Design a protein with these regions (language model features):
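C-terminal beta-strand-loop-alpha-helix "lid" module of Rossmann-like NAD(P)-dependent dehydrogenases
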Residues: 6-248
């Protein structure tokens, strides 16, 4: 839920007593040179414009980053995203993750992606991380989203909120944040994967419904065409029989 996520992020930010010593996962590296983009798509097709809408959103962001002279790295989650991006951005794709064997989306899959991102961040492989997915609105409408997850996006930045804490901690602040921040990233990824999964199912249901309706319309059209051809053939045979009888 958006409000829960906002409150959780506010809680994490409020837990920081000294912005200068805050974890980099929270405040960033201070640079914007390398951007990591995590693109969530499906492993299966036949779901309408679901995948192409995410790819279009991601490509627009890629072009913007590259025009600014910044480096781009991509992690694709789902084989369809990899298939559509590998030709143009193959050199930028550093990982392709698939969950074909998973029957249902679960937190452990999200944590696997989250741990990979955190490991690469700790190895100083990127400065910013943005995740791309479809937000579920209803079965006929899914909205492509781009959400920054590293550093933690400040949703109250327009209010010029200060990053400082008035709380007392037990255990200490560093221990709490060292556990909470990685879980927060995995939770955000899990939320995006759930939104994406619901959007995929809605898009696939709509696509299959349209395909069934179109197939029904085609069958009706072909049935009418067949009956007309059959009727014309019968009429022609009757005319030939009558003409032959008259000639006798």
């Amino acid at each position: 839920h958006k409000e829960y996520r906002r409150q959780r992020q506010m809680c994490i930010r409020d837990s920081v007593s000294d912005p200068q010593s805050a974890p980099k996962l929270l405040v960033g590296t201070g640079k914007e040179d390398v951007h990591l983009c995590v693109v969530l798509t499906s492993d299966r097709g036949l779901c309408g414009g679901f995948n192409s809408n995410i790819i279009k959103k991601a490509k627009n962001y890629f072009e913007k980053i590259q025009k600014e002279g910044k480096s781009l790295k991509i992690i694709t989650v789902g084989s369809k995203g990899y298939d559509q991006l590998k030709r143009q951005y193959g050199n930028s794709i550093i990982e392709n993750i698939s969950f074909k064997e998973s029957k249902n989306i679960n937190y452990f899959d999200a944590a696997k992606v989250g741990n990979l991102i955190i490991e690469k961040f700790q190895n100083e492989e990127f400065d910013f991380c943005t995740i791309f997915f479809n937000k579920f609105k209803n079965v006929i409408s899914q909205i492509p989203q781009a959400q920054q997850i590293i550093p933690l996006e400040n949703e109250n930045k327009d209010k010029d909120e200060k990053l400082e804490s008035n709380y007392e901690f037990e255990p200490d602040e560093d221990e709490i944040l060292s556990n909470l921040l990685p879980k927060n990233i995995s939770t955000q990824i899990f939320k995006a994967m759930l939104e994406n999964s619901a959007s995929e199912q809605g898009s696939r249901m709509t696509a299959m419904d349209n395909a069934t309706r179109n197939a029904g319309d085609l069958v009706d059209k072909l049935t009418i065409q067949y009956n007309r051809s059959r009727q014309a053939a019968i009429t022609k045979e009757l005319i030939e029989i009558i003409s032959g009888a008259e000639s006798l």
